[in-house]
Amino acid sequence: IFECVFSCDIEKEGKPCKPKGEKKCTGGWKCKIKLCLKI
């Protein structure tokens, strides 16, 4: 699990990169420059 540098509440493929209220990315995503990237 990677910590998000930016607030990343974007949804991609129906899955939130960082769910609201969470401080870290979940579900195999990480945030980079406000983009959700699959890891």
Swiss-Prot record:
The keyword Disulfide bond applies. Its main location: secreted. It is found in: Secreted. Disulfide bonds join C4-C25, C8-C31, C17-C36. InterPro entries: Hwtx-2-like (IPR012625). Expressed by the venom gland. Keywords: Calcium channel impairing toxin, Disulfide bond, Ion channel impairing toxin, Neurotoxin, Secreted, Toxin, Voltage-gated calcium channel impairing toxin. One of its GO terms (molecular function) is toxin activity. Insecticidal toxin that is lethal to cockroaches. Inhibits voltage-gated calcium channels (Cav) in rat cerebellar granule cells. This is Omega-theraphotoxin-Asp1f.
